[in-house]
Amino acid sequence: MEARAIAKFVRIAPRKVKIVVDLVRGKQVDEALAILKHTPKGASPVVIKLIQSAVANAENNHEMDREQLFVSEVYANQGPTMKRFRPRAMGRATTIRKRTSHIGIVVKEK
């Protein structure tokens, strides 16, 4: 049995989120939360909240034991890119791409 949680349209670039999610893939849930708590990255609080949501889904919806849960799948896919423009010299403008992510976590029992 598995439980999942998904955060969509998170305003962090997927390249930056992938660095954080690679740290917790395959880890026990409590160990993953401890690792993320001490990781100084902007995506860490988002992934912590997502793991807590997946654990709550497992406990409440599927009656799983928290001690047996581990992170079986975790992914950070690219969402839509918001395009903004920055004025530059001589009447030009450059595009600023504000990237978003879709982050998903699946927890399973051992």
Swiss-Prot record:
Superkingdom, natural source: Bacteria
GO cellular component terms, A-Z: cytosolic large ribosomal subunit
Keyword match rRNA-binding: yes
Listed GO biological process terms: translation
GO molecular function: rRNA binding; structural constituent of ribosome
PROSITE patterns: RIBOSOMAL_L22
Keywords: Ribonucleoprotein, Ribosomal protein, RNA-binding, rRNA-binding
Pfam families linked to this entry: Ribosomal_L22
InterPro entries documented for this protein: Ribosomal_uL22, Ribosomal_uL22_bac/chlpt-type, Ribosomal_uL22_bac/org-type, Ribosomal_uL22_CS, Ribosomal_uL22_sf
Record Gene3D superfamilies: Ribosomal protein L22/L17
Subunit structure: Part of the 50S ribosomal subunit.
Role: This protein binds specifically to 23S rRNA; its binding is stimulated by other ribosomal proteins, e.g. L4, L17, and L20. It is important during the early stages of 50S assembly. It makes multiple contacts with different domains of the 23S rRNA in the assembled 50S subunit and ribosome.
Family: Belongs to the universal ribosomal protein uL22 family.
NCBIfam families attached to this UniProt entry: rplV_bact
Protein name: Large ribosomal subunit protein uL22
Organism lineage: Bacteria, Bacillati, Bacillota, Clostridia, Peptostreptococcales
